[in-house]
Amino acid sequence: MVIPELFSAGLILLLLFITGFVGMKMKIPDVVIFILLGIAVGGLLSGSHLLHFAGEVGIVLLFFMLGMEFPLKQLMSIAKKVLRAGILDVALSFGVTMAICMMMGLDVITSLIIGGVAYATSSSITAKMLESSKRMANPESEFMLGLLIFEDLVAPILVAVLVGLTAGMALTAGSMSLLVVKVVALVAGAVILGVFLFRKLGSFFDRHMKHDLFILFVIGLALMYGGLALYLDLSEVLGAFLAGIMLAEVKRTHELELMVVRFRDLLLPLFFLYFGTTISFSEGIPMIPLLILVLVWSVIAKVIVGVLGGRWYGLTKKVSLRAGLSLTQRGEFSIIIASLAAGSIKAFSSVFILASAMIGILLFQFAPSIANKFYGKKAKTSVKQHVGSA
């Protein structure tokens, strides 16, 4: 007797709830829990097109909502404040990691993928831990969130480049130029629509946002622009993020987020679950020496970015160290990039993500006490505040 898909869908959602609830009680991020669940049930769900599509919609809505947080003027302001730290982050976390992989004998595309996996700190894990540990009011939180936003701007473009390269595009000057043209065209389209169309539709949104039909317009826009990015052989993540930036120009972010958030919360766990089902350890954990090397470097790189970037931002040495130790966990963007890989590289990336998430959680929790051991318990909140009070 064939099990109805409706029953299977309900069972999957209940399993996600149970494992997520257990993870919450154990203070393990739900991202990690859902991936582990996917690995455990991979034999039953592998190759499910419906699960893949539902998860894809979930990740599109995640980055659509992220884009809605940042009107163009705010994006430019944040980018300027953390620009030096952001560039250092790209150079160390992405560039040096890629160089390490190439020195260990990997090809350029594989090295790019692993560098991409090691690049971005998990926004969701970091934000949740800042809130749960009551450190959101600490002086380092503004710098950390600014750096995360910078990564959120860079990472979709990085994903778009990697999507193009893993789709079979040769790494030549011509192919890279074409890729840049596509990205610029997609970004320009979003900026033009945002500034010249959506910025003028505030009254239209006010009149119609409360109608049940309006959610079709909002989510339809996110899916369509994400789909346009896929049509251009770019990433749906970039398209969704840009669609969010478009709607941010309406200046009705809070109301629009309330419309979308429940759909995101329903579908996003399915993305992490599906990713887990695609991971296979049938041949064991590949390239263990390289894995350890990349894992150690990924922690060191983020600490350096936090220490130097925090000082450039105006934080004290102690607060900067606390920030650096709180940035080492990888998550959603690393998973998106890892999903572009195949076979042993996907398994390698998956172990790295899970290990870095767990190490990052521990370092985040012990960051204040470690910083106290280095610099003592009393420290001024920031260089700027100290100068101002003097």
From Swiss-Prot:
Membrane spanning stretches: 2-22, 31-51, 52-72, 94-114, 143-163, 178-198, 212-232, 266-286, 288-308, 351-371
Cellular component GO terms, alphabetical: plasma membrane
Stored InterPro entries: Cation/H_exchanger_TM, Na+/solute_symporter_sf
A biological process term (GO) from this entry: ammonium transmembrane transport
Signal peptide: none
Membrane protein topology class: Multi-pass membrane protein
Quaternary structure annotation from Swiss-Prot or TrEMBL: Interacts with AmhM.
Family, as annotated: Belongs to the monovalent cation:proton antiporter 2 (CPA2) transporter (TC 2.A.37) family.
Protein name (Swiss-Prot/TrEMBL): Ammonium/H(+) antiporter subunit AmhT
High-level lineage: Bacteria, Bacillati, Bacillota, Bacilli, Bacillales
